[in-house]
Amino acid sequence: MPELPEVETSRRGIEPHLVGNVIQYAVVRNGRLRWPVAEEIMKLSDQLVLSIQRRAKYLLIELANGWIIVHLGMSGSLRILPEERPAEKHDHVDLVMADGKVLRYTDPRRFGAWLWSDDLERCSVLAHLGPEPLSDDFNGFYLYTRSSNKKTLIKPWLMDNKLVVGVGNIYANEALFTAHIQPDRPAQTLTEREAHLLAETIKKVLQRSIERGGTTLRDFLQSDGKPGYFAQELFVYGRAGEPCRICGEQIESIKLGQRSTFFCRHCQY
């Protein structure tokens, strides 16, 4: 599933091609995504793109009369292509631009979404979200304060979008390893020092992944069609049974909150 770094990589990749350009019209080949493609999108005509923003794992395309909200779901990706490039089986939505390019949305599993909002402040999918992990609002003091009396296990707790957005399964695993914190401890056991280290580590892991173009494990591609390269730097995620890159002990895997969790029992405590 594309997580925050992959969505931010997509945003940065499409921004130079869309901002200041005009969407002539949209082509919707299959509108049966997680939610039906918004009617406002299907009726787009000659709309100037003002900005491309991101909130959590949602891409926000600002137009004069509203916002296109895109979620990549489990297997979605966005590419900038020539208009004449034929669509393939899983290419469901195109935004046809005035300069002859298209923004093409590909989603084999169709769990993504193309929504519309006239007012982001009243948009239900963006309500009740926690702070952005790369913002100043997310820090060790915030994390330590929120962990007080929390019996939830640390890893599922980190993945709660009401606590902080965008720390998905890959990056929760990697951040906890780098911070030397066992993923199945109750959140309330975090010390103040650990909370500060964990907040700092989450920022560094996410930023490094963004710099490397995200993590491609299966379907994700950058806007130019290239994979993300952070997968080559993973310490624990997807490495059950392999030796730890730090100590050589075997990486273990358990289920927490119905999600696969990877850790090194020697390096994390």
Curated annotation (Swiss-Prot):
The gene is mutM. Pfam families: Fapy_DNA_glyco, H2TH, zf-FPG_IleRS. One of its GO terms (molecular function) is class I DNA-(apurinic or apyrimidinic site) endonuclease activity. The active site is at P2, E3, K57, R259. It comes from Photorhabdus laumondii subsp. laumondii (strain DSM 15139 / CIP 105565 / TT01). The keyword Iron-sulfur does not apply. Keywords: DNA damage, DNA repair, DNA-binding, Glycosidase, Hydrolase, Lyase, Metal-binding, Multifunctional enzyme, Zinc, Zinc-finger. This is Formamidopyrimidine-DNA glycosylase. GO terms for biological process: base-excision repair. PANTHER family: FORMAMIDOPYRIMIDINE-DNA GLYCOSYLASE. Involved in base excision repair of DNA damaged by oxidation or by mutagenic agents. Acts as a DNA glycosylase that recognizes and removes damaged bases. Has a preference for oxidized purines, such as 7,8-dihydro-8-oxoguanine (8-oxoG). Has AP (apurinic/apyrimidinic) lyase activity and introduces nicks in the DNA strand. Cleaves the DNA backbone by beta-delta elimination to generate a single-strand break at the site of the removed base with both 3'- and 5'-phosphates. It catalyses: Hydrolysis of DNA containing ring-opened 7-methylguanine residues, releasing 2,6-diamino-4-hydroxy-5-(N-methyl)formamidopyrimidine; 2'-deoxyribonucleotide-(2'-deoxyribose 5'-phosphate)-2'-deoxyribonucleotide-DNA = a 3'-end 2'-deoxyribonucleotide-(2,3-dehydro-2,3-deoxyribose 5'-phosphate)-DNA + a 5'-end 5'-phospho-2'-deoxyribonucleoside-DNA + H(+). Monomer.
